[in-house]
Amino acid sequence: MTEIQEKLLEALSASLKGESVEWEPLSQEELSELYNLAHIHQILPLVYEAVYKSQGVNPQVKAISMRAAMTQALSTRDFLQLVSKMNEAKLYPLVVKGIIARKLYPIPDERVSGDEDLLITKELFPTYHQFFTEHNLVTGDDLEPYEVPYQLKGSSLYIELHKTLFQEESVAY
């Protein structure tokens, strides 16, 4: 593990405890690598929150971090509204990963999620597909895979509708 990878884990750990790291100043190159790695793993807001007090404010990283957290908050709002509409329609998918995992973080919207995952039975897929298309969610033409992606028009909300939890063809499961 590289020194920057170790610092990433240290910053994430501090963030989860609501603390800041206390490091000697890192070089601009090291900070860039740290923030890049955090961005790749979708934890930039968490890492930046723990790091900026000891390393100084980086306006560009701060803006990216804040934008990511705000976008996540809007996606969460859109998702919760969609779930409410599903419940009104007597549709009750199992929510897995995403919003559930974010509840483990002190500030859930700082843990960016690329998508929300819903698990349904294969038999109910046509019902959910119809509901989604009637509620401004779009997808591609291939509806056969074990998971079908949907994007809410005008939103960053991206949903993967799973017909099974794992790929049946996968040798890992």
Label the model's feature ranges.
Residues 1-114, 120-173:
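Conserved NTP-donor binding/palm subdomain of two-metal-ion nucleotidyltransferases/polymerases, i.e.
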